[in-house]
């Protein structure tokens, strides 16, 4: 299988994107900045909850777990994990604006003692070994150019027996078709994705990091409707009125919404859910 194309991603541009647009994300999409899992005709916000529920169920999140949420956005997953599982959550984001907004909400909810947020670049993050029961990654790994190294760091910070829970944008798990290349390139550029990789790539990187892969599921069919809803938001008259006042990168981002619909429809893109475990002390790794 051919290697996934690599695309240059400027960390400063990623930070600026989330600093500038997080308030609009919350206004138009809510506090959960990720796909939804659609089973019928649910609302997008209900579907977003269902995606978290599915990942948490597959990962068997233990009550009271210490969780690291990498790419935490506005804290949607962090607050949900604290509410439903009593977790102690540390959220990591590249965006000072997101960290400030999420910290303000945590204080307002009286959760500052167990839901906190840090500004860190996950590309340069140096993890404390054996610290967390769960590392939760909801659609942020796409931004990172060195995914094998990133998953090694995730494995390092997990306690023995700890769990890695990941949802990720992917490309189809087959050699890339020539007519998919320009579409993938346009999406990666607009969405600041360093690469769009395959289900097999992610599984291999987790195994190489010393983890046992418990689940590697293609749930594309259930998440694809997300972008039909996003395309409607992009066509909203208020958004169309606002767009000319934004920078070129923001306009390119919004104009990519219909490209996402197309990419899912023609099978160029996919979506994966992964659960992997760090072997407990003295336990042999399972090959998955």
Where are the regions that the model predicts?
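Conserved Class I S-adenosyl-L-methionine
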Residues: 215-288
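Class I SAM-dependent methyltransferase SAM/SAH-binding core
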Residues: 68, 77-124
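Short, glycine-/aromatic-enriched active-site segment of Class I SAM-dependent methyltransferases
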Residues: 170-193
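Short alpha-helix
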Residues: 194-210, 216
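A short glycine-rich, Lys/Arg-flanked "PGG" loop and its adjoining helix->strand segment in the class I
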Residues: 148-163
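A short acidic, Gly/Pro-enriched loop at the edge of an enzyme's catalytic core
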Residues: 123-135
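Conserved alpha-helix/loop element of class I SAM-dependent methyltransferases that forms part
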Residues: 31-32, 42-63
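N-terminal auxiliary segments of SAM/dcSAM-dependent transferases
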Residues: 1-27
């Amino acid at each position: 299988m051919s290697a996934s194309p690599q695309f240059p991603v400027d960390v400063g541009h990623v930070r600026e994107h989330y600093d500038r647009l997080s308030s609009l994300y919350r206004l138009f999409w809510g506090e959960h900045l990720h796909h939804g899992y659609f089973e019928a005709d649910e609302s997008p916000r209900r579907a977003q909850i269902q995606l978290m529920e599915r990942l948490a169920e597959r990962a068997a999140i233990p009550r009271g777990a210490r969780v690291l949420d990498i790419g935490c956005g506005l804290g949607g997953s962090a607050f949900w994990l604290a509410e439903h599982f009593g977790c102690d959550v540390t959220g990591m984001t590249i965006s000072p604006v997101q960290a400030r907004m999420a910290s303000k909400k945590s204080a307002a909810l009286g959760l500052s003692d167990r839901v906190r947020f840090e500004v860190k670049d996950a590309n340069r993050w140096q993890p404390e070994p054996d610290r967390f029961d769960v590392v939760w990654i909801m659609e942020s790994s796409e931004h990172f150019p060195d995914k094998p190294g990133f998953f090694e760091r995730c494995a390092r910070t997990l306690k023995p027996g700890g769990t890695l829970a990941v949802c990720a944008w992917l490309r189809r798990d087959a050699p890339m078709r020539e007519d998919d290349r320009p579409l993938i390139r346009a999406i990666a550029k607009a969405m600041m994705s360093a690469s769009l990789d395959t289900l097999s790539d992610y599984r291999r990187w987790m195994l190489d990091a010393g983890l046992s892969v418990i689940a590697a599921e293609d749930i594309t069919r259930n998440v694809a409707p997300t972008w039909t809803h996003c395309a409607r938001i992009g066509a909203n008259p208020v958004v169309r009125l606002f767009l000319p006042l934004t920078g070129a990168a923001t306009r390119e981002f919004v104009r990519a919404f219909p490209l996402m619909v197309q990419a899912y429809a023609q099978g160029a893109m996919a979506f994966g859910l992964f659960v992997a475990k760090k072997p407990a002390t003295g336990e042999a790794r399972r090959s998955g």
